[in-house]
Structures are given as structure tokens and as C-alpha cells.
């Protein structure tokens, strides 16, 4: 343990290590996917909210957006925790609960941690990014269902209690983390299925409608394979 991550707490006596694991900046990765899709003819409408599916006699005929109707006979719902809200006219729904994950980002500091750290019971993970910032994430926590608005977008804000609890877990694993000033805090909502595996299928009673939801926090890692399946 000390050879790989010498500054971890002395409370840690053993760990597993996977040389092929890694991590990447999720924002930069999504932007790279977007640019690659555009090179292949994909058109994005950012900020265009889908209000309703247009279904007639068991067939999809289009979707109603915040800027008008889009006629189509094929649609993939891959909208995470919002998926079931768009399927109220169907007998199908994705079984999911919606917990929140507390995420804390620090100001950049000197590089002291190379591997991604995860705790065995999955209640905390951390990594040091290329910039030097640390990013800590809690495990799945109960969410009260409330959303606020930030930069004209819905925003899930974790409670101070959850922030402090996540920090304490981080300090127990990496004591030097106490010297890193906090830069930002936010909450991430999980579309968590009972077995923590996604549902990718045709919607049985609506011809032309497909669903990919319930990724349970694994979407970033399995996205490349998911694209081939869909």
C-alpha cells in the first residue's frame, strides 16, 4: 500500500490494486464524444427540453420539445432520473430509486496521489485530477427530491451534513487532504436500479421507442460498449 500511495493513512493495512484502471475528466470526455459524433453527422440541440412523447395507437410519432414538435418514428430515452417522467403514457417503467451522491472538489495542490481510491463499502471515493484538484465522492445517500436552479439549469444540492460526512471519510483515508481548500460542492443524482445494472431495451408497448436508463453510476465506464449495443 505504501509503495503505491505512501501518504495514505496508517489506519489502512491492506488494499487491492488494478493496474488497468484509470480515470478521466468527465466534462472533457463528454465534449470529445460530442465532437466525434458531430464529425459523423450528429446534430445536437443543447438546452431543448423534451416535454412529451407523441404516441398514437402504440406507435411513436414524434416528441414535443420546448421549441415545438419533432416528427420521428424512432426515439431513444437515455435521460437518467427523468426517464420515467416521459413514459407516463406507457405501461413500462424502469425500476429505480434516486439517491444523491455528494461531490467535493478542492483547489489545485501539489500532486500527492496517483491511483483512484475507493473504500470497500463504497461510501467514499477520491482521486487527484490532472490539475492537482482532489475530487471526493460519497456513496449513495438519501435525497429529499428538491432541486434548485443554477445557471438556469436544475441543480441538486447536498446538505452541509452530507458534505462534512464525506470530508471526514476523506480525511480518514488521506490526512493531508485537510490542507486542500474546497473549491466547489455539488450533488449528482443516481438512476439506481435494484441490481445496479442498466435497462437497455425496446419499450414493449410502444413501437419505435427505446430506453437506456438505470446506469446506477456506471455510465461513464460502460458508455463505449453501450453505444454498440444501442
Please state what every model-predicted region is:
Residues 65, 69-115:
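Central helical "cap/lid" subdomain
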Residues 110-208:
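Active-site lid/adjacent beta-loop-alpha segment flanking the redox-cofactor pocket in flavoenzymes
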Residues 16-74:
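Helical element adjacent to the flavin cofactor pocket in flavoenzyme catalytic cores
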Residues 62, 103-105, 125, 199, ...:
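Conserved hydrophobic/aromatic beta-strand scaffold that supports enzyme active sites
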Residues 5-12, 54-61, 70, 192-196, ...:
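A short, glycine/Asx- and small/polar-enriched loop/turn
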Residues 204-230:
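C-terminal lid/capping helical subdomain adjacent to the catalytic/cofactor pocket in oxidative enzymes
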Residues 2, 43-45, 181-183:
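General small-molecule cofactor/ligand-binding pocket signal
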Residues 1-13, 140-144:
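A conserved beta-strand/loop capping segment in the N-terminal third of enzymes
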